[in-house]
Structures are given as C-alpha cells and as structure tokens.
C-alpha cells in the first residue's frame, strides 16, 4: 500500500557501518564514524556485540572477499554491481582475531587513504593480501595472486557488459 505520509523516511537509525548496495569498479564497506544516516540506497550495518568494527571493515578489503562479492552479487546495465542483503551473508571474509588491534588500525588507515585519494584499489588489496592473508593467515602468495586474477576476470566481465 502507499504510505500515508510518503514524504517521511520510514526508518532512520545510526548504523555502525555502510555497505554500498550498488557499486562501479569495486564494492565499498565503510565505517560510520560521523553518525550518518541513510535510506536503503546503502546497507546499514549494525555489528553484534563483541565484533570490533575496524576488524570487520579491514577483513573485507582483500582479494578473496572481492571475488566472492562478484560471485554473490548481481550485475546490471552499465556494469553496476548490486549486492542485496541475503547475498552479503554469502561473502567470505577472513577472521582477524589474531591480528593485533594496532596493526588493524594502521592497515585500515592506509586502506582508507588509498580510497579517499581515489587511488587504485589494487594497492589496498596488495597491502591487505600481503600483510593479512599471507603474513598473518598463512596463505601462499601464489594463491592470493590466483584469487586476484579471478576477481579481476569477474570484474572485467561485469564492466564489459555495460
């Protein structure tokens, strides 16, 4: 049915983070440090108790999670990648419990600077793949490189459809 007060936003609350619903070159998961609100153009994320927001955000920025986002999401005209709430739950992210919090914050700050300065997202993925997947979690560098190739192939396929 049509809302009686169509001009009112139906649900306003301050989330811990936002995951952009529709993306161009790569998906974006951002910490909400300024108590911003949003309509449903972005997924509003509220972390469970015991989940450290910085760990959650950093755990997303790697080749594995980007490849799974392309696999789980859907592609629309112009090469847009859309990720729905149910699809978000299918994206694999590494568990970073063993990574010291100072290191998490340091890496997240570097990723943030790359993104804010419109740098190449692959610089951020290189950093997190090397520092987290390889150095902390024991992935072989060749495996990370193969997974990056998978993400790039899926990304190119999506972008070329537009």
Residues of each region from the PLM?
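Non-catalytic DNA-recognition/assembly elements of restriction-modification systems
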Residues: 97-162
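Polybasic, glycine- and aromatic-enriched phosphate-binding surface used to engage nucleic acids
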Residues: 1-113
């Amino acid at each position: 049915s049509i809302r009686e007060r169509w001009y009112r936003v139906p649900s306003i609350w301050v989330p811990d983070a936002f995951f952009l619903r529709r993306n161009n070159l790569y998906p974006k998961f951002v910490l909400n440090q300024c108590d911003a609100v949003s309509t449903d153009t972005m997924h509003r994320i509220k972390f469970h108790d015991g989940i450290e927001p910085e760990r959650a955000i950093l755990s997303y920025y790697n080749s594995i999670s980007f490849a799974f986002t392309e696999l789980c999401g859907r592609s629309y005209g112009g090469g847009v990648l859309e990720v729905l709430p149910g699809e978000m739950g299918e994206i694999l992210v590494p568990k970073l419990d063993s990574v010291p919090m100072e290191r998490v914050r340091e890496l997240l700050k570097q990723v943030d600077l790359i993104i804010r300065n419109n740098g190449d997202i692959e610089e951020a993925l290189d950093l997190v793949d090397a520092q987290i997947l390889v150095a902390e979690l024991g992935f072989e560098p060749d495996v990370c490189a193969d997974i990056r190739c998978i993400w790039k192939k899926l990304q190119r396929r999506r972008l070329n459809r537009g």
